[in-house]
A protein has these predicted regions:
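Rossmann-like NAD(P)-binding element
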Residues: 16-51
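Internal alpha-helical scaffold of NAD(P)-dependent oxidoreductase catalytic cores
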Residues: 96-183
Length: 324
């Protein structure tokens, strides 16, 4: 309804009927189990040339359903590697897919012309099409998305359980802790289904992680500083080698950290400077826990261009600015 109201959609329907027989492409954007139910209804409706695709984070369950229903020639699994911890149409934007990887998982029976057509369509949206087998896709997303979400949620639970009645840990957990656990605020309904549908890969990786954490505990018991040093060094080296020129599964956060004096009106001055230069703010505030942060004032912006422009504007006024 929101998309219709703002003009993105020309029309929408609340039931599946023969109207969908004229569709060239149908995107299934509900949770995996719901999409599988929709497939059963669509089978007798869509035309032979219609392309069916989904945007789910797990591929093998829906690919299996497609095979059972005899719809392989019409289906290409899809997974845009974009998003944030916020869900729903209100948090979408018109450049969401630009320079983002878009996984495609066609079956052996998918019509070649449909694969070519859909790849061109995806590239036309500014995304980078990458073809994978369903099982490859599910392991990759378990490693770089599903397990990290579980770990982020567990870190939050760890602090929540350790917090006392006065809520001191919550009060002090701003800055770095809130950044690394941001994805723990994702939709519980969506993650319930993801974990159910990709449980095998998730359990394999979590078991490996538990083993590694136990090794850290063992080495701490031995007071093995060299091991701890190498542990962080290897992690840092690999993390620094990860490219950031394209969008990944986690929506990139564009931030400026600014050194400001503790004086009345300082935040308003900074905000006014940015507004005067047509730079929109997503959020702005003082960082009270700055153990791992640079700068007193944190400014969250909407995109990389705004971030660079904002830094330039403030630096020209002699503010010390750090870009993240």
């Amino acid at each position: 309804k929101m998309a219709k109201e703002d003009g993105t959609l020309t029309q929408y329907f609340e039931t599946l009927d023969s109207t969908f027989s004229s569709c060239d492409i149908i995107f299934l954007c509900a949770p995996v189990s719901n999409n599988i139910e929709y497939l059963k209804e669509l089978k007798g409706i869509i035309s032979e040339s219609c392309l069916l695709t989904d945007v789910g984070s797990v591929k093998e369950p829906i690919q299996s359903a497609i095979k059972e229903l005899g719809m392989e020639s019409n289906f290409i699994g899809g997974h845009p590697m974009v998003g944030s911890e916020k869900s729903g149409y209100a948090h979408a934007n018109d450049h969401l897919l630009e320079n983002a990887y878009y996984f495609l998982t066609p079956s052996e029976r998918t019509l070649f012309q449909l694969t070519t057509k859909f790849s061109s369509f995806i590239q036309g949206l500014g995304a980078l099409a990458v073809s994978l087998k369903p099982e490859e896709h599910d392991f990759i997303t378990a490693a770089i998305s599903h397990v990290p979400h579980i770990v982020a949620a567990e870190l939050v639970h760890l602090v929540r359980r350790a917090d006392r009645n006065n809520g001191m840990l919550k009060q002090l957990a701003a800055g770095g802790f809130k950044d690394i656990t941001r994805i723990a605020s994702s939709s519980p309904v969506m993650w319930e289904q993801i974990c159910e549908n990709n449980s095998s890969n998730i359990k394999t990786l979590l078991t490996s992680m538990i083993h590694d954490l136990q090794e850290v505990i063992d080495q701490l018991d031995k007071e093995n500083g060299a091991y701890v040093n190498e542990y962080f060094k290897e992690a840092g080296d690999y993390r620094n080698s990860v490219p950031d020129h394209s969008i990944g599964l986690f929506d990139k956060v564009h931030k400026l950290y600014v050194h400001i004096p503790d004086q009345p009106g300082t935040i308003a001055t900074v905000a006014s400077l940015l507004a005067f230069n047509n730079i929109s703010l997503k959020n702005i505030g003082i960082i009270y826990n700055r153990e791992f942060e640079e700068g007193v004032l944190e400014i969250v912006l909407y995109d990389e261009e705004s971030c660079q422009k904002g830094a330039q504007v403030l630096e020209e006024r002699n503010y010390i600015v750090h870009i993240r």
